[in-house]
Amino acid sequence: MKKALAISLALALGAAFGFEAKFEGEKVVFACPAAGTFRLECQTGKVKLSAAEGAVDFAVTEAKSNQMLLSMLVPPSFIQGGAWRVDAQEGAFPFALGLDEKLFKGNGREIAVKDVNGETLVLGFPVGTYFEVQDNRKWNWNTFEYRIFIPAETKEWRMTYSFTPAQGRKKLMDKFGQTPRDFPGKISDEAELKADVASEKAFYRSLDFAGRLARKGIRLDAFGGVAGTGRKFGLKKTGFFHLEKRGERHYLVDPAGNAFFHLGVCVFGGGDDLTDVTGREDAFEWLPPHEGPFAAAWKTDEPYWSTRAVSHYRANLVRKFGSYDHTEAAVRNIARVRQAGFNSMGAFGEVSAAARKAFFPYVRQFPFWGIKKIPSIRGVFDPYDAETVKSVEQALDSVRADADDPLLIGYFLDNEQAFEAIARAVPELDDSWAAKRAFTASGKTAEAFVEDFLEKYYSVIEKAFRARDPNHLLLGNRWMPSTADNETLCRVAGRHLDAISINYYAREIDRAFVQRVYARTGGLPQIWSEFFYSAGRESNVGPFTFDVPTQRARGEAYGRYVKAAVSMGFVVGVEWFTLIDQAATGRFFQGVGGESYNTGLLSVTDRPYRDLWTGMRDANLKVIGTLK
C-alpha cells in the first residue's frame, strides 16, 4: 500500500505575539499568541497553496499516494488543562495514558485545540474528512496527535481557520519551576527549601546502605565492588574495570579485582532539567536573572543556549545552598545516591571531574556528535568514506586523556541508532555516498550487504579505540529493543564489543528476548542501559508509558526490574534514567514538545522522592547480596 500524503502540523507553545497565518514555501504556518504555532508541510507529495480570508486553499500537484493524511502534533504540556474537539464532541487531553490510545475516531468537519488559557485554534475541513485524536504515549512518543484523512478523490479543497484569544493568562510554572497542579511535596515558600537541608541530611543518613551491608557481613572496596569476592571467585586484579565469566555467571570486575554490579544513574550532571524559554518567557512566573548567583541556572557553557535554556532546579539550589556549582552539586548528589546503593554514573553524566573528586566510577560516550551521518540511517556514519573514517579517528584521539583512569568503566559507542534501516536506506542513496558505491560493487542483495556494512562500521571504531585506549571496555550502542532483535546486528557486534547495551524499557522483562540477544552475540554480557518508571500524580511532571500510582510503587517496580536483571546471569549492570526530573515544560534540546516525565530521583525543588529512595535502597541491598 502506498504511503499517505503526509502534511505535518507541529504545535508549539508561546511562539508568537498576535495571531498570524503565513506561507513558508509549501508550509502553512499559523502562529498563535500562546496556544502555539502550527506548521503544515507536505512531506510525500507537492501542493499549491493560496490564501483566502480566513482560509487556505490546497491543490494537489503531485500525489504519491491514494489518500491525504494530515498529522497535527500537540505537545505534552496540554495535559495541564488543554482540550480537544471534533465537531460537537470534546474532551480533555488526559494526564495519564488510558487503555485506548484513540481519544476519538470518526467523521467530521471541524477540529479545535484549546490550551489552558482558553486560546483556541479551529480548523475546518471538507465533507467526508475522517479524524482520529491519538495519545502517542502508547508508543513512548510524548505527544498527542490529530490524524486527519482527506478523501482520496479530493484534489482541491479549502481549510478554514479561526482563532480565539485568551481572556487573561495563566502561568505554566511558578517561580520554583512547579506546575499549577497540586501534588505531594509541592512547596510554596523559599523557607521550605532552606528547612529541607537539615531534614534531608537526616533522611540520607538513615538510608545507611554501607551500614546495612556491614550488618550482613558484606564490605565494599573503594570502587564499590564486594570485598573478598576476587579471592572467592578467582577474579583478576588488573587495575581497570573488566569482564570475566565464572561458570554460568558473568562478572564486571572492578580495578581491585572484586565483583561489581553497575548500579548507575543517567544524566547525573543534569541537562534534562533545562527547558527552552525562547518566545514563551511570559508563560513563567519568574525566570532567573543573567547576573549574580542565579546566572548559573542558565546553560552558560554553550553560547547559543546561554539565554534560551534555564533550569529551575539549579535556581532552587541557589535558594537552598546560596550558590550553584556544577561539580560541587554532582559531588553532593554522589554522596546521596551512594546511601541508596548506587555505585556509578550512567550515560550522559558530563561530570567526570566530580566522579574523580568523589572517587565514583563512571561511563562515557564517544564524541561522535560532529561526524557526518547518513541522513536516512539515524546516528550512523558512512564507514566506507575515507574522510569520515579520518574524522572518527580524530574524535577518538580524545580517549587518550582518560586511558589510565581506573574509575572509568568504559565507553558507549552511541545511543539508539537505527541500524535496522541499513537495508532500506543504502540502496536509496545516490553515488556520492561511499556506502552506496560499495553496495553496488558488492553485487549483493541489500539484506546481504548489511553484514558487510556493520563489519566495516564496528571494525573502524574498534581498531581506532583499542589503539588509543587498551584499558577500557566497549559497552555497545545502547540499542532500542526493536533494533537489538536482529540476528545479523547481534552477530557482527558480538565480534567487536566487550558488552551489549540495551535501552530496555519494560513493565515486565521478556526473558526470551534478552536471552536471544545474548545467544546471537556469542554470549556477550549485557548492560540494560536505560529505564525508569514514573508516578506522575505524585510529582511535578507528567506520566510516562510505564506509570505507577505512587512513588512507593516506583521503588517496587525498580526492585522487580533489577531482580530480573541479576537473575539472568549475563546482565552486569543497569542504568536508571535520570537523577533529576525532566523539566515540566519540556527538556531544552527538544523544544516545548520535549520529554517532560517524572524520571528523577529528585524533584525540581531538589526533594528526594523518599519512598522511591527507600525502595531502591532495599533492592540494591539484594543485588549486592547476590555477589558475595
Predicted regions located by residue number:
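Sec-dependent N-terminal signal peptides
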Residues: K3-G14
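Active-site groove signature of glycoside hydrolases
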Residues: A395-E451, L475-G476, V571-T578
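Beta-strand-rich recognition/accessory modules
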Residues: E41-Q43, K48-S50, D57, T61-L73, ...
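Active-site-adjacent substrate/metal-binding segments within catalytic domains
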Residues: D196-A355, P375-A401, P406-L407, E447, ...
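Aromatic-rich peripheral "rim/lid" segments of glycoside hydrolase catalytic domains that contact
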Residues: E428-A438, F577-K628
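Active-site clefts of carbohydrate-active enzymes
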Residues: A309-N316, K372-F381, G443, M480-P481, ...
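Substrate-binding cleft of secreted/luminal carbohydrate-active enzymes
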Residues: P406-G410, D414-E416, F531, F546-L602, ...
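Glycoside hydrolase catalytic-domain groove-lining segments
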Residues: A448-K463, A467-F544, G559, K563
